[in-house]
Amino acid sequence: MSKYDAKQMSDTKHAEDQFERELQAAIDLIVQSKHPKKIVVAGPGAGKTSLFKKLLSKSKLANQDASHLVVTFISALAEELKHDLSELADVFTFHAHCKQLLHKNLYLREGLIEGFRVFPKLPSLIKRDWSLLNADDKDPPHFVNLMREAIDSDTTRFFIDRSNYYDAVSFDDMVFRVYLKLAAAPHAAERHELILVDEYQDFNLLEISLLDLLSRKSPIVVAGDDDQVLYGALRSSNWNFIRSCYSSPDCEACQLPFCLRCPEVVVNAFDDVVRAATAAGHLKGRIPKVYRYFPPSKGRDSAAHPKLHVIQTSIQKNGMGNYFGRVIAEVVLSIPAHYIKVSRDGGYPTVLIIGNKQYLTQVSAYLKERGYILDEKVDTEGEEDQIKREDGLKILKEDAGSSLGWRIMLEMDKPNFFTQAAARMLSTKPLVPMIPKAYRDGVSAEVQKFEEPPAKTKQPQPEFAKPTIKLTSFQSAKGLSAEYVFIVGLHDGDLPKSPNKINDIEVCKFLVALTRTRKQCYLLWTRRFAGVPKKPSMFLNWIDRSRKNSTYVDAKYLNEREKQGRPRTS
């Protein structure tokens, strides 16, 4: 080794040591702080789980019997956190934590039996009850929205009363029940030596109000990032909640400054998008934060993958015109074996394909035709709230006297005796004696024959040496990461939906998608989708040209690639 090479290695090591010290200083600041309420702003891949482990370990060291609670919103994240932290803390989604509290605490579940049933479709049924019991008001309230706003009113109390009638709960009302009871008697809250909250930006006003009550008896650390708010329309979360917490004099504000997941080009592209969005008048009120590339863990990946790949195709449709699918399949073949092994050992996808349904469906079809085993969610949009006959039969199979089960059957069949006397019947508990024997006998015979469909078999996994491939929407990409990320369908009209009226959530979707990347990111758009002309997303122009390699893919390009018989370099 020459003196020059030795000096260069020494300089690199010195620089990396500086980064390590800076990261450690940021972590120590949080871990050593004795402030009872801290907020940690941490961008994608900033190492929150590692921080949580240090906080919990310190508390356990001081008191081996310390009670710790970790909560998050996303089920997949809760499972990951359980894997890493279950020896140090109880880990739940917030809904699951509230369910546990209701089972344990008679005061909190007042009006419910201990063995209450969780029925996610309960709001749909109670809306029908409202219409039947309030003849002059046929438009039922948006119960869930009201509860998410922590509104205690006659309307939300109606929901709780009906929930008690059925001895059943759904997700939001579990939280609402606990909130109402603890708001009336804060001393009834459990005490923990430490509460940790992940993805704080995903929590709505109801959940944040309950967390505030819990924090009055227990030290709390909340972690999140206002660049990753994706669920506003779905569940009433809001940027303002995390921003208010960050600026509150009651909280100590901290940051994790580095991205430990992404290569340098992705972190720089993230910064480009934030700067461009801010300059265009978006992301107003954004928390100012440091988000930097971390050479000690990402230097090698950054050198191997210095550019984002922007793929423009001439067309995109099913069959041989499925250029998105063909490009992705070709790249997948080129993924190094050691990348596949690292992802399989780490339990995360080798490949993550993110986009809207119309593009994912076509890519999925192409990859399946070529024998790839895919991890993809079956589309059930609109079915989650739809009450089905099977719901009632299943409940009655388990409990023949269940008022909920019989109410579902009455809703399905709408027999004359019920529609003519619904108000009287729904005001009587239990419901069963109010139902004519002939109808009861008919339903009971149906229940007797009913066999619950077998549980879905676990999705098959590819051989260990093969890559795992997951397809997901922009919103469901939260909490995921992969060696290779493909973001498909980046057009004006898709993301953003309207380039002249960009929503901040659309910017956040793009930022979240980019930062799923551990090694290489591909950005795909087409000039014509299913015969309809398309224009590239303006978000692509927000990324500095120097960070992108661009390729135009048409029939000629693909034919030449096939003749050459070699995969695309990655």
Show where each model-derived region lies:
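Accessory N-terminal region flanking or inserted into the helicase ATPase core
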Residues: 2-46, 50-51, 112, 116-196, ...
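Conserved helicase/translocase motor-coupling segment
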Residues: 315-436
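Catalytic acidic motif of RecA-like/P-loop NTPases
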Residues: 196, 200-204, 209, 227-228, ...
